[in-house]
């Protein structure tokens, strides 16, 4: 159990190191207004904190830096909520006020804004497409044998792909087919499309479309849509601006992981409800052992739809990042609940 004096010194060391990226010595602490102890007392308390594993020495300085254990204690016990500026709050509210009818655009824009507000890398796992409902289908001819099939969902998700159009299918059949699909499938959840097509759409197509077999090939190509979530990044290169990552060899594996994206998809998909903070080696990937990942989930009702996360050095502005994530997920969840209730 740490004493009040040790708690104050530990918090001051971590706050100072987060801001400066420089090891903190007893002389630096003695100049702080909140530290009223003698230099000898400060040195003794720092020695005790080091022995307890909360701070550690560096090779290049006589000062101390927080250990992973120190950061974990700081996050769990010493953090105080940080106030955002009025301009920042307005910027966030404007995002959700303008585009909440298109959830994926909000997710994409959220990643960009969060990266700008934190100077870290922001990652947003978009809403699950499986929870979306079909809003519109379009099949637009590109030439004699190809067309682009466009699927739009109720959350603004747009999925497009190029499909092959058999020569036996004319524009009249294509138009009839699109009209039937929109009439029969509007408002149907994406996960139920296949059953709906088999039970109802196929019969109608057989009745009204001349080249039925060819129409079915187009149908198969149009609705081969992945139902997995999309992942959006903001500030992928921001880690390079951090002093800890000026050594390219040290950060290479992390940059490769960020560029690949797939690992983060797996990590964020497993996140539990609420705010989670993973520090250093608490992360599942060795490439992230010098990083902290703070994540928060957003939802509709009791259903978790996605995750917003910030990746930065262990020397992260934890209070600010957590406050931002709480505000983003609050507005995202409120907006999505309003969006789904209005349907």
Swiss-Prot record:
Keywords per UniProt: Repressor, Stress response, Transcription, Transcription regulation
GO biological process: negative regulation of DNA-templated transcription
Gene: hrcA
Family to which this protein belongs: Belongs to the HrcA family.
Function comment: Negative regulator of class I heat shock genes (grpE-dnaK-dnaJ and groELS operons). Prevents heat-shock induction of these operons.
Chain ranges passing through the membrane: none
Molecular function GO labels: DNA binding
Naturally occurring in which organism (per UniProt): Bacillus cytotoxicus (strain DSM 22905 / CIP 110041 / 391-98 / NVH 391-98)
Protein name stated in the entry: Heat-inducible transcription repressor HrcA
InterPro entries: GAF-like_dom_sf, HrcA, HrcA_C, WH-like_DNA-bd_sf, WH_DNA-bd_sf, WHTH_transcript_rep_HrcA_IDD
Pfam families in alphabetical order: HrcA (PF01628)
Keyword Cell membrane: no
Top-rank taxon, per record: Bacteria
């Amino acid at each position: 159990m740490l004493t009040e004096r040790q708690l104050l010194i530990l918090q001051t060391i971590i706050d100072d190191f987060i801001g400066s990226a420089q090891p903190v010595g007893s002389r630096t602490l003695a100049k702080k207004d909140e530290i009223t102890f003698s230099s000898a007392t400060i040195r003794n308390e720092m020695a005790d904190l080091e022995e307890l594993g909360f701070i550690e020495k560096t090779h290049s300085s006589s000062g101390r830096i927080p250990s992973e254990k120190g950061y974990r204690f700081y996050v769990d016990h010493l953090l105080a909520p940080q106030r955002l500026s009025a301009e920042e709050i307005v910027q966030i509210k404007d995002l959700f006020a303008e585009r909440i009818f298109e959830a994926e655009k909000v997710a994409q824009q959220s990643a960009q804004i969060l990266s700008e507000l934190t100077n870290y890398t922001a990652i947003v796992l978009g809403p699950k497409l499986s929870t979306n409902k079909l809003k519109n289908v379009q099949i637009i001819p590109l030439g004699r044998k190809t067309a682009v099939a466009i699927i739009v969902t109720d959350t603004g998700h747009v999925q497009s792909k190029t499909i092959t159009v058999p020569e036996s299918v004319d524009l009249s059949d294509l138009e009839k087919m699109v009209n039937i699909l929109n009439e029969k499938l509007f408002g149907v959840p994406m996960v139920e499309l296949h059953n709906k097509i088999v039970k109802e759409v196929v019969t109608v197509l057989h009745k009204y479309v001349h080249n039925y077999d060819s129409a079915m090939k187009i149908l198969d190509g149009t609705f081969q849509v992945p139902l997995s979530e999309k992942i959006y990044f903001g500030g992928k290169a921001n880690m390079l601006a951090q002093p800890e990552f000026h050594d390219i060899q040290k950060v290479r594996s992390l940059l490769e992981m960020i560029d690949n994206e797939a690992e983060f998809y797996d990590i964020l998909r497993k996140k539990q409800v609420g705010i989670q903070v993973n520090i250093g080696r608490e992360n599942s990937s060795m490439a992230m052992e010098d990083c902290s990942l703070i994540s928060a989930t957003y939802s509709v009702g009791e259903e978790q739809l996605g995750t917003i996360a910030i990746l930065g050095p262990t020397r992260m502005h934890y209070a600010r990042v957590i406050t931002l994530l709480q505000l983003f997920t609050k507005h995202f969840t409120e907006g999505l609940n309003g969006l789904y209730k209005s349907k």
